Amino acid sequence: MPSNVRSGVLTLLHTACGAGVLAMPFAFKPFGLMPGLITLTFCGICSLCGLLLQTRIAKYVPKSENASFAKLTQLINPSISVVFDFAIAVKCFGVGVSYLIIVGDLVPQIVQSIFYRNDDNMSGSQEHHMFLDRRLYITLIIVFVISPLCFKRSLNSLRYASMIAIVSVAYLSGLIIYHFVNRHQLERGQVYFMVPHGDSQSHSPLTTLPIFVFAYTCHHNMFSVINEQVDKSFKVIRRIPIFAIVLAYFLYIIIGGTGYMTFGENIVGNILTLYPNSISTTIGRLAMLLLVMLAFPLQCHPCRSSVKNIIIFIENFRKGKLYDNRASFIPLDNFNSEDPQEAPTQQNNEEPNLRSESLRHINIITLCILLFSYLLAISITSLAKVLAIVGATGSTSISFILPGLFGYKLIGSEFTGTNERVPTSIKIFKYLSLSLFIWGIAVMVASLSAIVFLGTSSH
């Protein structure tokens, strides 16, 4: 495998396999094992179709420019650029909130395992409860660690977070396999191989379906990967999403399948909270804690840029000026929202805009993102609920709806107004695009309706 292809695979894999893997076993709960595996497979295929469509439509961007969702909107309708910015803002904001929830889940357990392991007399004291309050640690970490990083204009210091993420997820996989093999010490519930029935089905499968969708979402970085390739032919580039999705699929089988079989119906939204305190578990919790602390700024920066773009769009709309270009917008084209190795590229692009725009406005947006993230994180304890909402909105838009829309509008457009026969392969991709677009709309509407009316808890 060529090095640039390998690099692209690792970029997509890291983007997809973030801290959301902690909720993967919980996603199996309303499905049962076999239907869960089938759903995981189907969502993987749909996500792969979206990535393959992106490799097909990248050629419609002029060769002198880098491919991006923003550039493609200029070929269809510049006004829909706000849809892409909204999807990015929702996804990045939601992922940031989920990171803070993970902080609230893990830090009290880390503190308890280190300082209160052998102190049973503290279990009922007021001091004990105060030092194990999740809100305390969310507050401390967002004030002293996350906020300073989010207000930085350079993310170069976070370039090693990608390696930390890969190592953390690999360690988590090993930890889950170990406890699956040695599960006699754990409180295991009923494992359903088919869909749970009766009282055992606490909530609808539609409420956790978006977690499967969210798990494969790496589409916002696909164009950046394509732009880095020397050979941009479909025959070569298609290997990148295929390898990445297949690797992610097997990783999710390990984490999701074995995690569900370990705890059964007792599984919760964050599997790490179920393991007993031990050195190996504490190391895993510390690794995931470090991951989410370093990754939060990588979500805040693109969220901030998207919010700024939306504000500019609204201002232009009120003035009756919908530009045919995005010269006044903060670019997201080359920003990898989860890979710190891409962050310097975005920073270089963002510098001129930061000089022209008021830093005060940028700081206000950053402060609002941090404040609302904090308020939601201390109010919501369900990691699964946040990931389900993000998956049903931002992930479906980025993975299915936008690639489907662009594919249907652009693929085969070169044959419009000509007498040439449209090749069968072009027709297949065009109608695949339409199907993916319809599927994305259906998932969004059905899942959001289920979440709103049926609810999603972490238990």
Curated annotation (Swiss-Prot):
It is found in: Vacuole membrane. Pfam families: Aa_trans. One of its GO terms (molecular function) is L-arginine transmembrane transporter activity. One of its GO terms (cellular component) is membrane. The keyword Transmembrane applies. GO terms for biological process: amino acid transmembrane transport; transmembrane transport. Keywords: Amino-acid transport, Membrane, Transmembrane, Transmembrane helix, Transport, Vacuole. Signal peptide: none annotated. Residues 335-354 are annotated as: Disordered. InterPro entries: AA_transpt_TM. Residues 335-351 have a biased composition (Polar residues). Its main location: membrane. The chain crosses the membrane at residues 8-28, 33-53, 82-102, 131-151, 161-181, 206-226, 240-260, 278-298, 364-384, 386-406, 434-454. It comes from the Eukaryota. It is a multi-pass membrane protein. Belongs to the amino acid/polyamine transporter 2 family. Probable amino acid transporter of unknown specificity. This is Vacuolar amino acid transporter 5. It comes from Saccharomyces cerevisiae (strain ATCC 204508 / S288c) (Baker's yeast). The gene is AVT5.
